[in-house]
Amino acid sequence: MKHITDLYESVNSTMSNKSDCPPVVLPEEVFFTISVIGVLENLIVLLAVIKNKNLQSPMYFFICSLAISDMLGSLYKILENILIIFRNMGYLEPRGGFESTADDVVDSLFILSLLGSICSLSAIAADRYITIFHALQYQRLVTPRRAAVVLLIIWACCIGSGITIVTFSHHVPAVIAFTALFPLMLVFILCLYGHMFLLARSHARRVSTLPRANMKGAITLTVLLGVFIFCWAPFVLHILLMTFCPADPYCACYLALFQVNAVLIMCNAIIDPFIYAFRSPELRDAFKKMIICKRYP
């Protein structure tokens, strides 16, 4: 919260001095409501996979990882609002030691949300690539145990990177490293897509004989990736502009949309579960069983 709040205060200062564009301010109730819905939706996804043995496969493990990332992004805003309420009620000393520590923890959740989403989408992309072009070896190459190990490595790296970024968040190299992860992830996934496209053209007949579920999973990834880019790209651009051209009047007008960009990030956590449910009959069935309290096989 400290780093994001400082950023927002700096934006407001820039608006008043360098631009005719007033900052767009949204009610805190909007943030809180979206965050609570995001946590509940992704918690349902996790419970559905945990309770349904038919969903306990590497693909759904990676989806659960993405759901956890979305939950962290929603929890970030909920905890931030709680801290603000406590501070306004006088229970926290402004800029005090406890608040500073709590701010770092909350900011770490935000960083973890982005890093976890990037890595989870990359893992899903790699999984779909293997599913389509190494279908016969898939069961041998991608086992639940190997998927679990990959996820442990991913989250260990995310936690380490998140702590480092929060610790050095006021240094330009740290900001560049943080924002660079976004395009690097896109390049990695687009390279996989490009390779898949070239192989699909040269092996059109073999690809057409693949199980429909394999191709459907690739389409699901495409939708998830598109939503992720739409929701996160404006904020990443915001960070870059705030770092390199905060005084420019054109940049300042874009920076006025800080809270709008923040809402887009939280909407990502709400949209993803609907994509899972819409694209996966197995998950839809699991959700229905959870709603009517029917036992799983």
From Swiss-Prot:
An example Gene Ontology molecular-function term: G protein-coupled receptor activity
Pfam family, one: 7tm_1
Glycosylated residues in this chain: N12, N17
Cellular localization per UniProt: Cell membrane
Residues with lipidation of kind S-palmitoyl cysteine: C293
Broad class of the protein's primary localization: membrane
Gene Ontology terms: cellular component: cytoplasm; plasma membrane
Membrane topology label: Multi-pass membrane protein
One annotated GO biological process: adenylate cyclase-activating G protein-coupled receptor signaling pathway
Keyword Transferase among record annotations: no
Record family assignment: Belongs to the G-protein coupled receptor 1 family.
Described purpose of this protein according to its UniProt entry: Hormone receptor primarily expressed in adrenal cortex that plays a key role in regulating adrenocortical function. Upon corticotropin (ACTH) binding, facilitates the release of adrenal glucocorticoids, including cortisol and corticosterone. In addition, MC2R is required for fetal and neonatal adrenal gland development. Mechanistically, activates adenylate cyclase (cAMP), the MAPK cascade as well as the cAMP-dependent protein kinase A pathway leading to steroidogenic factor 1/NR5A1-mediated transcriptional activation.
Subunit details: Homodimer. Interacts with corticotropin (ACTH). Interacts with MRAP; this interaction targets MC2R to the plasma membrane. Interacts with MRAP2; competing with MRAP for binding to MC2R and impairing the binding of corticotropin (ACTH).
Name of the protein: Adrenocorticotropic hormone receptor
Gene name of the record: MC2R
